[in-house]
Amino acid sequence: MSIASDPLIAGLDDQQREAVLAPRGPVCVLAGAGTGKTRTITHRIASLVASGHVAAGQVLAVTFTQRAAGEMRSRLRALDAAARTGSGVGAVQALTFHAAAYRQLRYFWSRVIADTGWQLLDSKFAVVARAASRTRLHASTDDVRDLAGEIEWAKASLIGPEEYVTAVAAARRDPPLDAAQIAAVYSEYEALKARGDGVTLLDFDDLLLHTAAAIENDAAVAEEFQDRYRCFVVDEYQDVTPLQQRVLSAWLGDRDDLTVVGDANQTIYSFTGASPRFLLDFSRRFPDAAVVRLERDYRSTPQVVSLANRVIAAARGRVAGSKLRLSGQREPGPVPSFHEHSDEPAEAATVAASIARLIASGTPPSEVAILYRVNAQSEVYEEALTQAGIAYQVRGGEGFFNRQEIKQALLALQRVSERDTDAALSDVVRAVLAPLGLTAQPPVGTRARERWEALTALAELVDDELAQRPALQLPGLLAELRRRAEARHPPVVQGVTLASLHAAKGLEWDAVFLVGLADGTLPISHALAHGPNSEPVEEERRLLYVGITRARVHLALSWALSRSPGGRQSRKPSRFLNGIAPQTRADPVPGTSRRNRGAAARCRICNNELNTSAAVMLRRCETCAADVDEELLLQLKSWRLSTAKEQNVPAYVVFTDNTLIAIAELLPTDDAALIAIPGIGARKLEQYGSDVLQLVRGRT
């Protein structure tokens, strides 16, 4: 049979064909986005089996997700049916690392660990929580989740409890809690898994650790395993952790029949322990390795590919040295567009309007995605799509109002509303959110930071509402939030996809909107804290590259100059767009992103519009100078403290700081002047008015 007529070779381009026909032995396929790597991998496996180099049962293909493993198995079965060679390539095992290790450990366990049994932990949460308690660490739910994540990172990085503190410092990693505390919890966690009842608890990392140890330390096990599997294929090799590499090395032994496929410039999971160094060092470990580059992109238009190339061309560091120069193979399409907006609601409204036009012109909603850096950014887009009547689904996360921390916040606000407080709404909201995790600075832990981002988004949403309706009180706010929550479409497969850039890896759509591309969000602020030229910042650049390469035809990139309508426009476009995005102006909003709710309050000093609840309370811009009677302010605070103690309520329930400042500035001398200050209603006038006016009169 000629190559042209061989169904395992026909239809491949010359780069793919080179990879498929490479001889047995170490092969490294550097495959860019959209270059057909899965097709190339499966055809290589089928070719090796069909040519008799290896039996189907002796091949082990591993990847990182069940979805990817399932896709590989499906394609191998299809090739088996199409080739009609009788090779049985459809029987090749394509598994995740953990699934492969689970099967192997179950088979070898009794031979290497004597008579003790084992049980797999579906979740380590309960054991980590118990370990934290036994070390006298008072850990919240988010703390426990962050501790579990940190233990996973350590084990994936082959770092034990006794080495953790030193390793974290050497890696310049920001642990979610004190490193010594984490090490103590980690040590206790490992001790708790050895229950002493004849059953050992194993987490998913233990599957890999015990599998590697069994092969490394038992010659009979190694011989049996290495006789069973003789050829290995690893997909997404740039995402391998040191622990997974240890397992792979144990599988191989002193052999080199290994094919790896990856792209170091799509390494975006370093927080899990993934490292591109194994891909970058492949030719050093195997000097005779064949290296094939796949650079023909069949997914995206030349216009999208060109932008991706320009973004990654500016990359720095060792990873950048392996970058591929993609060449778009599709028909030309529209040029990617760049849009600057005055604020986030305007950005979201414009994106929703653009999506509506795409859908009207025939693009299925399921072929459209909105991608952002952090999950908390989804709220404004959920609202905009809801207002536009466009169904959506949130991938890799929950809808904003379905998140646990938001449900907790709304419940807490409902309880406060039952106390009939007249305190300034913004202050009430922040006081309620503070115990739930809203701090002045974002926490370090991943889960705690996600909670903080969601709570911050809720607080900013309240500020947006107050800017439009300065007289808004808590019952009205809760009604508005309930309206938003109830109006949100339930997740539907046919809807527009909302996803973080991390969750979008491995997926593609006809149209992609990359939103919120402002410095401090992408690259994210905690990456910038490591320095502008640091590896964390470079990983953020790779995130943008991954996002761009998700688009087949339509691609729009956008950012907002401020969070809220009328807010200070201090944001800048992502530094990754420097020299790429054209000079832009803030785009006009299609229609209005918020309902017109009457004239805005204005500063009593400069007459500018007031856009925050604090400014409305003070009746001036927070930057405008004003005379505050400092002695009166101290007296008011002292009076508030004693009154709050008498009534057994928080101080803000009596009056907030901003209300006291307004009183000390405006010096009201009668009931009419006092009640004119926002935050002082009829009830508070009746309850506290005489005391306050007596203090003011004593100073005037």
UniProtKB/Swiss-Prot annotation:
Residue ranges annotated for the HRDC domain, each copy included: 626-700
Entries under SUPFAM superfamilies matching the protein: HRDC-like (SSF47819), P-loop containing nucleoside triphosphate hydrolases (SSF52540)
UvrD-like helicase ATP-binding domain residues: 10-301
Required cofactor names: Mg(2+)
Effect of Q266R: Loss of growth, no ATPase activity. No DNA unwinding. Does not translocate along DNA
Region (Not required for growth): 601-700
Region described as Disordered: spans on this chain: 565-595
Domain UvrD-like helicase C-terminal per the UniProt entry, residue ranges: 302-553
Keywords tagged on the record: ATP-binding, DNA damage, DNA repair, DNA-binding, Helicase, Hydrolase, Isomerase, Nucleotide-binding
GO cellular component: cytosol; DNA helicase complex
Sequence positions that bind ATP: G34, T35, G36, K37, T38, R39, R299
GO molecular function: 3'-5' DNA helicase activity; ATP binding; ATP hydrolysis activity; ATP-dependent activity, acting on DNA; DNA binding; DNA helicase activity; magnesium ion binding
Pfam families on file: HRDC, UvrD-helicase, UvrD_C
Outcome of gene disruption: Essential for growth; the 100 C-terminal residues are not required for growth.
Catalytic reaction annotation: Couples ATP hydrolysis with the unwinding of duplex DNA by translocating in the 3'-5' direction; ATP + H2O = ADP + phosphate + H(+)
EC number: 5.6.2.4
Top EC class for this record: isomerase
GO biological process: one example: recombinational repair
UniProt keyword annotation of DNA repair present: yes
Reported function: DNA-dependent ATPase, stimulated equally by ss- and dsDNA. Has both ATPase and helicase activities, and translocates along ssDNA displacing bound streptavidin. Its essentiality for growth does not depend on its helicase activity.
Family: Belongs to the helicase family. UvrD subfamily.
Protein name: ATP-dependent DNA helicase UvrD2
